[in-house]
Amino acid sequence: MTMDNPKVEQAGHAVDSAKLKQLNLAVDALEKQFGKGTIMRMGDGSAGLTVQAISTGSMALDFALGVGGLPRGRVTEIYGPESSGKTTLALHVIAEAQKEGGITAIVDAEHAFDPSYARKLGVDINALLISQPESGEQALSIVETLVRSGAVDVVVVDSVAALVPQAELEGEMGDSSMGLQARLMSQALRKLTGAISKSSTVCIFINQLRDKIGVMYGSPETTTGGKALKFYSSVRLDIRKIAQLKDGDELTGSRTRVKVVKNKVAPPFKMAEFDILYGEGISALGELIDLGVEFGVIKKAGSWFSYGTEKLGQGRESVKKILREDPVLYQKIHMQVKELMTGHTEIISSPTE
C-alpha cells in the first residue's frame, strides 16, 4: 500500500510535491539548454506583465493606444494613403525615443529621407542611424542585426512597398515577380518577432495602400507585402487626412485621424484626431486645446475659449498664441488634461511651434 504524495502550497493552490519536483527539473534543463529566462512563471515579476511603450508625440493617440504609446518588443504597422502623415508620425516616435535617451534607426528603402524636415520635428539627426539598402533582403537583414544587438530602441522601415526582392531587381522590366515580396516579408517576420520581443525594440513598418482588382463589395483597399505583416503586428494604425487647414487662402496643414485597427496590448478600434502642420509636424498646442475642451478643462462658448475664470481668447489660433507665450499656463492645462486622461501627471517642456 502506497501513501499519496504530499501537497505543497503554490500561489494559493495545493500542488503535488512530486509533480513540482519534476517541473523544477524540467525548468532547470530548459534553462541549461536555452539560457536563463527561457521559461518563467508569470507571477515572478520578471515575466513582463507591464507593457512598456514609447510615446507617439500625440497625447490623443497615446491615450487611444491604451498603454501610453507604441509598445516595446512588438511590431507596429502604420499605413494610409499617400501624404497622410505616416512618415511624420514615425519621425515623432523617433524624436520621443531620443528625448528619453534611446537609440533610433531608420531603414530608408524609399531613398527619400529628408533630414531638414526630420530636424524640424525634433529628431536629433546627428544621433540617428540611417541605412538606404539596395534590396529588400538587405533591408530586413539590417533590421534583424539592429534588433538582435539589443541596443536600438526604435527601428523604422520606410516603406514595405519599397522592399524590392533581389530576384526582382536582377530580372528584366516586365518579368513576373508575383508573391516574391509577400514570401520575403513572411520569412523575415518569422525570424524578427522573437528577436524584437527579447530586445524591447519598437519596430515600425510604414506601409502603403493599393486597390484590389475586381472587388464589388466591401473596401477595395489593401496593404502591400502580403498578409504576414497584418498577422505579426501587435498594433496597426490607419492614418488618414480628413480636412485641410488654411490660414486665409494659404494651406498650412491637415486635420488627421488615426484609427487603431488592431491592438494586442489594449482594446482596439479607438481613434485620435490631431493637426499636422506643414514643416512642423503634430501640433501639440492645437491638440492640447482640443483635448482640454473634450475633458472640460477648457470651456468653449461659441468661438471663445476660457480656462477657469480666465478668458483665453477668441478662436483656436489666438489661444495657441497665448499658450505658446505662457509656458506656466501651458503646463497647468497640460497636467490637468493628462491627469484626467491617464490618472497621473507628467511635466513636459512647452512646445516652441
From Swiss-Prot:
Where it mainly occurs, coarsely classed, is: cytoplasm
Mention any Pfam family matching this sequence: RecA
Highest taxon in the source lineage: Bacteria
Q: Which InterPro entries does the record cross-reference, listed alphabetically?
A: AAA+_ATPase (IPR003593), DNA_recomb/repair_RecA (IPR013765), DNA_recomb/repair_RecA_CS (IPR020584), P-loop_NTPase (IPR027417), RecA-like_C (IPR049261), RecA-like_N (IPR049428), RecA_ATP-bd (IPR020588), RecA_C_sf (IPR023400)
Quote the cellular component terms of the Gene Ontology held in the record. cytosol
Cellular localisation: Cytoplasm
| CDD domains xrefs | RecA
State whether keyword DNA damage applies: yes
Question: Which keywords are on file for this protein?
Answer: ATP-binding, Cytoplasm, DNA damage, DNA recombination, DNA repair, DNA-binding, Nucleotide-binding, SOS response
Where ATP binds, per the record, is at: 80-87
Q: Which GO terms describe its molecular function?
A: ATP binding; ATP hydrolysis activity; ATP-dependent DNA damage sensor activity; damaged DNA binding; single-stranded DNA binding
**What family is this protein classified in?**
Belongs to the RecA family.
Q: State what this protein does.
A: Can catalyze the hydrolysis of ATP in the presence of single-stranded DNA, the ATP-dependent uptake of single-stranded DNA by duplex DNA, and the ATP-dependent hybridization of homologous single-stranded DNAs. It interacts with LexA causing its activation and leading to its autocatalytic cleavage.
Q: What is this protein called?
A: Protein RecA
Organism, as annotated:
Chlorobium chlorochromatii (strain CaD3)
